């Protein structure tokens, strides 16, 4: 999943139009306006939506379908790590937008890889300590 989303990010960065960048920014803003504490499931869905938009930006239908499927898995990951990860996710999204605005495909892909590795680590901790351990940390 990490390699797929990283590759899609790299491709999207190289091909996106200013309008598509605006759509990505809007996706991040929608997610940032939702409450993590009161409706984490909805916010997790909004966070994952960014990758669906990135998949569409690649212009490759098959890749977009794979990315959309990975975004579903990513939503499950967000649900597992819980709302305590919201600040980390939003910070990563903002760094990703900064790299995309700079048209730096390698830096954007690195941000995705780094962020998802961190979330996978948090997921392993949450599963090892019980499903509510991390989400109760906030």
Question: Which residue ranges define each predicted feature?
Answer:
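A eukaryote-biased feature capturing mid-to-C-terminal, repeat/solenoid-rich segments of large proteins
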Residues: 11-19
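C-terminal effector-binding regulatory domain of bacterial HTH transcription factors
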Residues: 105-138
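Conserved amphipathic alpha-helical segments that form helical-bundle/coiled-coil interaction surfaces
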Residues: 3, 18-80, 91-98, 107-119
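Short, charged/polar low-complexity linear motifs in solvent-exposed/disordered segments
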Residues: 61, 81-83, 124-128
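Active-site loop of classical SDR/Rossmann-like NAD(P)-dependent oxidoreductases
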Residues: 85-87
